[in-house]
């Protein structure tokens, strides 16, 4: 709410070294995306808000619906399909998705799936082939594919992405590939991310300015 509440927030940036503070302007971030796949987290995601005229947009990527209700596999698959269609509806997004998949293919299992071939299809044929692919994936690979596809579909300039402990559901090689794909996407879109993590793999993959 500190970021998405239009005209109501008293949130500020703090410079801990200089003891200075600066209010966060209503339009500082264009959108906020929160990513959390913990089924036991007490966090209840707000309703998605995709309309920029109402303030900062908000998108949620995770397992929860409303309250304590969790999404089923069909919900997750449908969410992926809708995001994929959004990615393929615009050439720049399509190219960013293909670049992200290319980075993820440093993971051998991802490389063997032939995901980039989906870009050759559209309409019902795309839906059928994409649904078949995600149904055969392990939970970790499905989570990464859903997450990166939705991020490509939603991240715009000055988007803030919040990610909660990605290592909790991803093996190290896949986690490493995901963080690299995320970094490349955010660099391309001039976005930023805050990641809550205990993983040295995540820290290892975070880009460092010279």
Give short role names for the model-derived ranges:
Residues 36-38, 64, 197-200:
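A short beta-strand-to-loop transition that corresponds to the Sensor-1 phosphate-sensing loop
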Residues 12-17, 26, 39-145, 149-156, ...:
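Extended helical coiled-coil dimerization/tether regions that scaffold
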Residues 1-8, 124-210:
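Switch/communication elements of ASCE P-loop NTPase nucleotide-binding domains
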Residues 1-24:
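Extended, regular secondary-structure scaffolds
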Residues 29:
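ABC ATPase nucleotide-binding domain
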């Amino acid at each position: 709410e500190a970021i998405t509440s239009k005209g109501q927030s008293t949130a500020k940036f703090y410079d801990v070294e200089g003891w200075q503070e600066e209010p966060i302007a209503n339009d500082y971030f264009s959108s906020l995306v929160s990513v959390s796949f913990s089924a036991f987290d007490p966090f209840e995601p707000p309703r998605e808000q995709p309309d920029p005229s109402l303030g900062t947009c908000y998108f949620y990527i995770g397992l929860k619906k409303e309250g304590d209700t969790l999404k089923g596999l069909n919900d997750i698959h449908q969410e992926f399909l809708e995001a994929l269609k959004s990615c393929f509806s615009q050439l720049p997004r399509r190219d960013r998705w293909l670049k992200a998949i290319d980075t993820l293919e440093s993971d051998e299992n991802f490389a063997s799936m032939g995901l980039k071939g989906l870009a050759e299809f559209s309409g019902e044929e795309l839906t059928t082939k994409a649904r078949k692919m995600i149904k055969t994936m392990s939970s970790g690979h499905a989570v990464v594919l859903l997450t990166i596809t939705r991020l490509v579909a939603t991240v715009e300039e000055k988007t803030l992405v919040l990610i909660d402990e990605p290592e909790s559901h991803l093996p190290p090689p896949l986690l490493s590939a995901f963080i690299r794909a995320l970094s490349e996407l955010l660099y391309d879109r001039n976005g930023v991310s805050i990641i809550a993590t205990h993983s040295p793999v995540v820290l290892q993959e975070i880009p460092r300015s010279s």
